[in-house]
Amino acid sequence: MGNYSSHKRTKAPKQARKERPADMDKAWWKSFLNHLTRKKPATRIVLILPLDKRQPLANAGQRIDYASGAGLGSPAAPRLRGAGEGSEREPRMPVLLLLRRQEARRPEEGGARAALSWPRLLSRFRSPGKAPREAGPAEEQPRKRCRCPRPQL
């Protein structure tokens, strides 16, 4: 048997219950709304074009023809260069992903030139010295099907 009185001495005394004021529910609701307003938004903005602080801003008065792609590498508009045209090579995956999404949306909207615009844009993002990759032996073989415990209906 243990020493019951020593056990009682080590425990902290119980706190008395505090009375809740009448407007406590209002205060709880306000703190809940504050929590919602402080929460960071879920949307994220991804910059595709690199921002170089050392280069000057593009001239506002000069007109650039974006459809032909003539002004993208010009010194007049240094911040308007496309991906991969700067001094450092950056990953191009976000740009290609956005272009493919845009291409998938255009036929639904009724754009007649949607099929024509994609190959021209894709050729701009490829490096001039590299040829398109040949399909390797791993890509030629069909993918192995996943064996599921239940048959698919």
UniProtKB/Swiss-Prot annotation:
The protein's matches in InterPro entries, at most eight in alphabetical order, are given as:
Bcl-2-like_put
Q: Where is the composition biased (Low complexity)?
A: 67-78
Coiled-coil features, chain-numbered ranges? none
Q: Which organism is it from?
A: Homo sapiens (Human)
Question: Where is it made, tissue-wise?
Answer: Preferentially expressed in the testis.
Name of the gene this protein is made from: C20orf144
Please list where the region (Disordered) is annotated: 1-24, 65-94, 125-153
Here the segments flagged for biased composition (Basic residues) are 1-15, 144-153
Which named protein is this?
A: Uncharacterized protein C20orf144
Task: Name the source's superkingdom.
Answer: Eukaryota
